[in-house]
Amino acid sequence: MELLEEDLTCPICCSLFDDPRVLPCSHNFCKKCLEGILEGSVRNSLWRPAPFKCPTCRKETSATGINSLQVNYSLKGIVEKYNKIKISPKMPVCKGHLGQPLNIFCLTDMQLICGICATRGEHTKHVFCSIEDAYAQERDAFESLFQSFETWRRGDALSRLDTLETSKRKSLQLLTKDSDKVKEFFEKLQHTLDQKKNEILSDFETMKLAVMQAYDPEINKLNTILQEQRMAFNIAEAFKDVSEPIVFLQQMQEFREKIKVIKETPLPPSNLPASPLMKNFDTSQWEDIKLVDVDKLSLPQDTGTFISKIPWSFYKLFLLILLLGLVIVFGPTMFLEWSLFDDLATWKGCLSNFSSYLTKTADFIEQSVFYWEQVTDGFFIFNERFKNFTLVVLNNVAEFVCKYKLL
């Protein structure tokens, strides 16, 4: 075809001949191309028109007008036939028999075949018909098949896709919300619980991953089915208006096969089970757990109250020890002074000093008792508040560990 096109091309405009005219030298050119050359020759000549020369061989021709040149009807007809052949679709060939055109339609297998397939191949005993009859029959079949496929399970697939995406979104929202609760709860605990907090948050992330692993494959399957369905629609839209029988039958075969594959693909379920933890998670269930037993618990156990109380007798004993300590500190000094002096004046001085010591000691003890009472009162208040706060934290953490079997 390329070599033929070279012979049908005008040397001047390099396009297919348009109204070809033959010169006396037998060279062919388009009429418009010759008119352009002749017009330029006349314009450049001031006195008389110069002789017209062939653009190929430069042989002179009398410039009596282009219309006087003979039309090459043979070349013009060849160009017209070439244009028709170039525009018409190329005849498809058989894949099994090289170079054989697909010019027969097998009604048994509903596909295009060649003559060898019909006489010596696997279609020997099948029923055949002409391309025109097959085109008319398949054209009617296409309309009904297209209408039935247009609404085939598309609504069901879209509904299931929406259900799965909604379920996935809600599940992830629940897990995210629960994860935030755990983060807020563990932020109030001591640093010794950080490792346990990270383990629990890791469990939530694992559950998120499990949800995504459960939902994503099904969602991807539905997206693939819908994408295949859209591709089938695009194929149908592309060739439903095709009037060429061969091209239509070939496209119809591909369309039927794609529809068959789509219909045979099962739709995944839309009611995947959710984890019970996503529905029943509540941090209030941690309130009865003991923090002291966090590292020991693996199953829920009876909850109780952690009691830490300092008896009042301890404070009485502390005061007695303090008084005895004062006597021990000041007693040896007074005893030494008594043993060193024998006269009465010395004893009187010692007694006077002892009396002074007793007075100072009594004042000191009185002030010590007063400040100690203030300290113990403040300590009792702080102890009660700290005890209540500690009990709440201990019970909550122990309940959480028992419930979720973290150990």
Curated annotation (Swiss-Prot):
Coiled-coil positions: 172-200
UniProt-listed InterPro entries: TRIM/RBCC, Znf-RING_euk, Znf_B-box, Znf_RING, Znf_RING/FYVE/PHD, Znf_RING_CS
Pathways per UniProt: Protein modification; protein ubiquitination
EC number: 2.3.2.27
Disulphide bridges: none
Zinc finger (RING-type): 10-58
Binding-site residues, Zn(2+): 94, 97, 117, 123
Keyword hit for Transferase: yes
Keywords from the UniProt entry: Coiled coil, Endoplasmic reticulum, Immunity, Innate immunity, Membrane, Metal-binding, Transferase, Transmembrane, Transmembrane helix, Ubl conjugation, Ubl conjugation pathway, Zinc, Zinc-finger
Subunit structure, interactors included: Interacts (via C-terminal domain) with VCP. Interacts with AKT1; the interaction ubiquitinates AKT1 and leads to its proteasomal degradation. Interacts with MDM2; the interaction ubiquitinates AKT1 and leads to its proteasomal degradation. Interacts with p62/SQSTM1. Interacts with TRAF6. Interacts with IKBKG/NEMO.
Similarity remark: Belongs to the TRIM/RBCC family.
Protein name: E3 ubiquitin-protein ligase TRIM13
Organism of this sequence: Homo sapiens (Human)
